[in-house]
Amino acid sequence: TIEFEERMYAVGRIPGSFNRREGKPSERGILNSRIIDRPMRPLFDEELRNDTVVTCTVLANDYDNPVEIVASLGASISIASSDVPWNGPVATTNVCHIGGEYIVNPSADQRAAADCFVCIASTFEKVVMIETEANEAPEGVVLEAIRIAHETNMEIVKFINSIVAEIGKPKFTFEKAAVNHELLDDLMN
C-alpha cells in the first residue's frame, strides 16, 4: 500500500475554517499514490502475506517539479534497500514532446504546452506502467517518448542498484502457503 501525504504547509498554505485538519488525501494525492503503487505492486511475490506500507510525505513543493517522480523514486529505493522480498527496483520518468523536441521531466509549463506527454515506470528490463496524454500525436512520437523515458529509467535503476549494493539489507524468506488442491477442486466444480 502506498500512502501519499501532501501537507498544506508544503505548498505554503494553512488550512482554515471548515477543513482545519488534513484527514483525508486530496484527489491529487490519491492519483500520485496510484502512480507510485501501480508499477511497484506487481513486482511483489503474490504469495507474500506480510503487509507492506510506504508513506510518502511531501514536506515542500514548488509546483514546477513533479513531486510524484521524486516520491516514486524514494519509495522504490526504500523497498529495494529494505529486507522485503521484491523484484524491483523501478524508476519513473516523465517525457514530453514540444515542437519536435523531447524534454525529460518537464516543468509544469512545458507539460501544459506539450502535444504529447508520457509518464513511464520501468524496471531495467521492461516497461511496467504507461500513462499518456497525447493530443492526436503521431504514433512514432509517442513511441519515441516511451523509448527515451525507458532509457532514462534504466540509468536511474542502475543508480538505485548501486545504492542497494552499499546499504541494502538481505531479503527475508517466507513460507509460501500450501494449496489445498481438494478444496480448490471442490470449489471449481
Language-model segments: which ranges?
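Conserved nucleotide-binding/hydrolysis micro-motifs of P-loop NTPases
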Residues: M8-Y9, A60, G100, E136
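Short intrinsically disordered coil segments
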Residues: S17-R20, V70, A108-D109
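Glycine-rich anion/phosphate-binding loop at the beta-strand->alpha-helix junction
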Residues: L31, I36, E46-H97
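Mobile "lid/hinge" segments at catalytic clefts and subdomain interfaces of large enzymes
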Residues: D83-N189
